[in-house]
């Protein structure tokens, strides 16, 4: 009887250890899936995009399982701090302000920002004075407009899709967002124009996009960085990049 009980106890302990190992091997990524080509919902209501493919490649290197969870952009960092998710990969600029709240992986994408409007509506960035410009709420683009262009009215949106629709319908004059994202709109619309040059202010747009991780989780940051180096070395990063942005 003792032998049976001991065997059963060992079995239960082993099962608990195995269950914990499975839980530890799943990395829960939060993202805001209205930001093509980085993250968006496909026709089957599944999250797709550059960030998703990259995260899957990193998880493969770490021998871990990825899961992806759609959240509003301005809730990503709070959700990390409440430990609802392990990481956030959502075209997020690495900035000093964000580094006060979370840690980041090494940069995985170099970024710039751009103003876009309907053709012939806004001549240049100086002409934005007194205009209404759409931005995503909680984004560095919003901070840039408020602090660097106080003469411009910043109009916050929960998603850039909503801002784009309002611009097309004349409710706002321009949209300010990541260059790669607004470039997607030009593929579908022929009446758009860039307003001035790209903006690369490092205070707001950092030193590229990084994967945000809750402070104190240095182990995950190190694993992400090691895996990022690996996928860049083996050519997988380039394959993913070319899939979405071309050579």
What are these regions (language model features)?
Residues 144-157, 193-200, 226-247:
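Ligand-binding clefts/hinges and TM-proximal coupling segments of bilobed small-molecule sensing domains
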Residues 65-72, 135, 152-159:
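Short beta-strand-to-loop elements that line the ligand-binding cleft
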Residues 60, 69-70, 74-86, 101-103, ...:
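Short helices/loops that flank or line small-molecule/ion binding pockets
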